């Protein structure tokens, strides 16, 4: 799996919080390591931009969040597989989910309260990569 669940055991069962941080925490020639921190824990996952342009996906996700769209995803792919962050829903209720390559859901967040905060966080991540 291209992600590591670094959360305390059993902390995901009632996670309805928005993400607190999404950042690139390591950069190598062929890989970016992302860390997603949310109310009950954190994930780390790797992406190889040569396999799939995850930064372009994140830019599209931020655009969709800001425009109120009801379905968008970002894919983070490396030699070991992929992680998909998915946003879906309608009107004022959105569900955010994280899936591994086998399609198993990894708990993430839910609720419209996180929409703009998540878009802002993604924009900050993208700006940091432009400066790198």
Model regions: which residues?
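Mixed-charge, glycine-accented linear interaction segment located at domain edges/termini
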Residues: 98-132
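Short, surface-exposed beta-strand/loop "edge" segments at domain boundaries and coil↔beta transitions
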Residues: 41-45, 82-84, 101-109
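A short, sequence-level motif marking secondary-structure junctions
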Residues: 47-54, 88-93, 112-115
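Short, structured protein-protein interaction patches enriched in aromatics and acidic/basic residues
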Residues: 71-97
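Short, well-structured hydrophobic secondary-structure segments
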Residues: 43-80
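N-terminal intrinsically disordered, cationic/polar leader segments
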Residues: 5, 12-23, 38-45, 49, ...
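Short intrinsically disordered terminal tails
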Residues: 1-4, 131-132
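A short, structured beta-strand/loop element
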Residues: 29-40, 90, 95
């Amino acid at each position: 799996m291209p992600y590591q669940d670094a959360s305390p055991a059993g902390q995901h069962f009632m996670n309805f919080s928005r993400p607190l941080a999404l950042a690139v925490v390591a950069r190598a020639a062929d890989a970016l390591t992302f860390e997603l921190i949310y109310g009950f824990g954190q994930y780390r996952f790797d992406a190889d931009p040569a396999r799939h342009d995850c930064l372009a996906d994140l830019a599209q996700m931020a655009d969709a969040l800001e425009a109120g769209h009801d379905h968008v995803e970002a894919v983070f792919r490396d030699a070991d597989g992929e992680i998909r962050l998915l946003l879906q829903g309608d009107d004022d209720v959105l569900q955010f989910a994280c899936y591994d390559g086998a399609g198993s859901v990894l708990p993430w967040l839910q609720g419209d309260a996180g929409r703009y905060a998540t878009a802002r966080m993604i924009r900050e991540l993208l700006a940091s990569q432009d400066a790198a």
